[in-house]
């Protein structure tokens, strides 16, 4: 099997895993509600919380983080197996992670209308380089707590993780790939938050704890 075909298969695996809309599934199964008809219409944990089900929101957050991490870990395992068999293998881990992030934002099952990718990118960050995951989580929580804006927390976390990757100890080639893919995910994440950014600038963004 060619390297190109392997990369396509890894990307497809990551995308399909990332495209599973856990927020929508959980809200429908246990909350009897279509989360797309609630609040912002997003399928992520923040909007699931607006249904009044903190338990489902927590599960959504867990699974959205988990699918990003799992995509990276599966690709890492495959790369290691390939190395054991052939003596060489490309680093496909972050390709799978970026694909999972893309799948969450643009899931094929929902007409390519998905979430904003914060939790999934957090999972990718933890699995790709745990330091980036810690930086992401701390920056997300602190900025959300200080500003009381969930959107601000997610955007600051993604930017902080990308900056941290610039100091990642790795070969030049791997380092450049990580910087490029983390930067790409952050740019897309900010684009997915463009509505939030407009509301922040106009003073109309909902704060954490505000009634919907």
Curated annotation (Swiss-Prot):
GO terms for biological process: phospholipid biosynthetic process. It is found in: Cell inner membrane. It catalyses: an acyl phosphate + sn-glycerol 3-phosphate = a 1-acyl-sn-glycero-3-phosphate + phosphate. Pathway: Lipid metabolism; phospholipid metabolism. It is an enzyme of class 2 (transferase). Probably interacts with PlsX. It comes from the Bacteria. The keyword Cytoplasm does not apply. NCBIfam families: glycerol-3-phosphate 1-O-acyltransferase PlsY. This is Glycerol-3-phosphate acyltransferase. Catalyzes the transfer of an acyl group from acyl-phosphate (acyl-PO(4)) to glycerol-3-phosphate (G3P) to form lysophosphatidic acid (LPA). This enzyme utilizes acyl-phosphate as fatty acyl donor, but not acyl-CoA or acyl-ACP. InterPro entries: G3P_acylTferase_PlsY (IPR003811). Keywords: Cell inner membrane, Cell membrane, Lipid biosynthesis, Lipid metabolism, Membrane, Phospholipid biosynthesis, Phospholipid metabolism, Transferase, Transmembrane, Transmembrane helix. GO terms for cellular component: plasma membrane. One of its GO terms (molecular function) is acyl-phosphate glycerol-3-phosphate acyltransferase activity. Its EC number is 2.3.1.275. PANTHER family: GLYCEROL-3-PHOSPHATE ACYLTRANSFERASE-RELATED, INNER MEMBRANE PROTEIN YGIH. The chain crosses the membrane at residues 6-26, 56-76, 92-112, 122-142, 150-170, 171-191. Belongs to the PlsY family. Its main location: membrane. It is a multi-pass membrane protein.
């Amino acid at each position: 099997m060619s390297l190109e075909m392997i990369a396509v298969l890894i990307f497809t695996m990551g995308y399909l895993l990332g495209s599973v809309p856990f927020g929508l599934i959980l809200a429908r199964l246990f909350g009897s509600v279509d989360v797309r008809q609630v609040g912002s219409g997003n399928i992520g944990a923040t909007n699931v919380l607006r249904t009044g089900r903190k338990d489902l929101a927590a599960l959504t957050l867990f699974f959205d983080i988990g699918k990003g991490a799992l995509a990276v870990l599966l690709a890492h395992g495959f790369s290691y197996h390939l190395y054991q068999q052939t003596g060489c293998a490309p680093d496909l881990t972050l390709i799978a992670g970026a694909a999972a992030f893309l799948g969450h934002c643009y899931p094929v099952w929902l007409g390519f209308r998905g979430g904003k990718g914060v939790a999934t990118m957090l999972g990718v960050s933890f699995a790709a380089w745990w330091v980036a995951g810690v930086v992401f989580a701390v920056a997300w929580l602190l900025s959300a707590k200080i500003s009381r804006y969930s959107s601000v927390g997610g955007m600051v976390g993604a930017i902080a993780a990308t900056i941290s990757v610039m100091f990642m100890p790795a070969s030049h080639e791997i380092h450049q790939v990580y910087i490029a893919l983390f930067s790409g995910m952050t740019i897309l994440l900010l684009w997915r938050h463009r509505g939030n950014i407009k509301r922040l600038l106009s003073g109309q963004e909902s704060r954490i704890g505000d009634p919907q």
